């Protein structure tokens, strides 16, 4: 079972053939398409005509100010968001650094939530546009750290809320403070330890209650270390990258995360080996996801909190990252969602409040319109839509 999947850097030479890999040993990191690819994963290629390249139009120069925005919304049953928009409250600052002659792309998150037909809002999210100071990384190796996450709770609000409040705090405590031999390996190990520790903390608290809490939650987290994204995922929430292809002059939706459900072969094998079973596509006929935070009663049946971790090098052609829970993807394909957002970003009729940059108003509107449209299309789940703007 691969724990890590890499997105290759844009100009990395092609990987060896499958036969050669088989001879040389197992592949540790699964590659995703390079810059020029239009492959959108399982959804197939996504091509958008007549759209400007990333960084064109009103995207402008993004910056990362020292302030940070944390949005934690209670969420407990893998559903989505309230009716108010939640937005990153500071300007994005583009950090120019004489580091490998590169520019650190600014990142800024925007989010909207709708409760939908659910009685309770069980989704949660966190936006931390810049936590470099809190992480205190070795300045010779790392210039900027950002964190964005969505959590889709089930069985209650407590697991998703706990993860939103504690996972990034555990990550900050475990983040490398001194010089390291390999930033990539150290960050991946940090993420694995963080997920394990957060799950253990919640299960300890849940089991001490009378009756014991049975809540669980998915988790999709994007950790940006300079221009490298590390995507850690449990369950069926997703992260999608919108990347512009210069050759085709079209945009593509690239999947950054892997969904975990009990019908997948390796997931089912792990569950069965642990003594569990899969009925009607669910663990023991009940739980829809095969990896999660919480769900203590299913952990002995093969459900795990070990995330898949993928690595992606940002490029000048990247426009934004979409993070959303399955309430969105029940009624939108990744391609449709990205296309919808792009159309909103090109809408010059969107009005802005005095003092707010037009680009912020457009991203806020894109989140809110997409969440509203998901509800209109009949998503009965909570809906959380987070879009992370990539500044150039």
Curated annotation (Swiss-Prot):
Coarse class of the protein's main subcellular location: cytoplasm
Compartment annotation: Cytoplasm
GO cellular component terms, A-Z: cytoplasm
Biased composition (Low complexity): 31-40
Catalysis: reaction(s): O-phospho-L-seryl-[protein] + H2O = L-seryl-[protein] + phosphate; O-phospho-L-threonyl-[protein] + H2O = L-threonyl-[protein] + phosphate
Key word Hydrolase present: yes
Superkingdom field: Eukaryota
Induction: Activated in response to stress, such as the addition of ethanol to the culture medium or UV irradiation of cells. Inhibited rather than stimulated, by Magnesium.
Ranges where the PPM-type phosphatase domain occurs: 108-390
This protein's record includes keyword Acetylation: yes
Modified residue annotations for N-acetylmethionine: 1
Tissue/organ expression: Widely expressed. Highest expression observed in kidney, liver and muscle.
UniProt function note: Protein phosphatase that may play a role in regulation of cell cycle progression via dephosphorylation of its substrates whose appropriate phosphorylation states might be crucial for cell proliferation. Selectively associates with integrin linked kinase (ILK), to modulate cell adhesion and growth factor signaling. Inhibits the ILK-GSK3B signaling axis and may play an important role in inhibiting oncogenic transformation.
Oligomer and partners: Interacts with ILK.
Protein name: Integrin-linked kinase-associated serine/threonine phosphatase 2C
């Amino acid at each position: 079972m691969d724990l890590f999947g890499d997105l290759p850097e844009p100009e990395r030479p092609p990987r060896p053939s499958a036969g050669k890999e088989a001879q040389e040993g197992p592949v540790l990191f699964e590659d995703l398409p390079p810059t020029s690819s239009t492959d959108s994963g399982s959804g197939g290629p996504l091509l958008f005509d007549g759209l400007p390249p990333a960084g064109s139009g009103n995207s402008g120069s993004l910056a990362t100010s020292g302030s940070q925005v944390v949005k934690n919304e209670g969420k407990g049953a893998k559903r989505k968001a309230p009716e108010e928009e939640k937005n990153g409250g500071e300007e994005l600052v583009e950090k120019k650094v004489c580091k490998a002659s590169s520019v650190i792309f600014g990142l800024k998150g925007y989010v909207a939530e709708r409760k939908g037909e659910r009685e309770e809002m069980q989704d949660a999210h966190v936006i931390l546009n810049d936590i470099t100071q809190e992480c205190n990384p070795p300045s010779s190796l790392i210039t900027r750290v950002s964190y964005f996450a969505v959590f889709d709770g089930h069985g209650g609000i407590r697991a998703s809320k706990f993860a939103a409040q504690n996972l990034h705090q555990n990550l900050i405590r475990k983040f490398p403070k001194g010089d390291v031999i390999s930033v990539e390996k150290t960050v991946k190990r940090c993420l694995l330890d963080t997920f394990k520790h957060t799950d253990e903390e919640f299960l300890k608290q849940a089991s001490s209650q009378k009756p014991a809490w049975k809540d669980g939650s998915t988790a999709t987290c994007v950790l940006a270390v300079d221009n490298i994204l590390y995507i850690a995922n449990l369950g069926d929430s997703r992260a999608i990258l919108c990347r512009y292809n210069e050759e085709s002059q079209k945009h593509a939706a690239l999947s950054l995360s892997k969904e975990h459900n009990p019908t997948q072969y390796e997931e089912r094998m792990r569950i069965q080996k642990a003594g569990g079973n899969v009925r009607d596509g669910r663990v023991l006929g009940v739980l829809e996801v095969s990896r999660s935070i919480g769900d203590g009663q299913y952990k002995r049946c093969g459900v795990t909190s070990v995330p898949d971790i993928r690595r992606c090098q940002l490029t000048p052609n990247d426009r934004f990252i979409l993070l959303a829970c399955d309430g969105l993807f029940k009624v939108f394909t990744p391609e449709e969602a990205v296309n919808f957002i792009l159309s909103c970003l090109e809408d010059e009729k969107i009005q802005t409040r005095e003092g707010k940059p037009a680009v912020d108003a457009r991203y806020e509107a894109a989140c809110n319109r997409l969440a509203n449209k998901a509800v209109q299309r009949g998503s009965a789940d909570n809906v959380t839509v987070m879009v992370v703007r990539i500044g150039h």
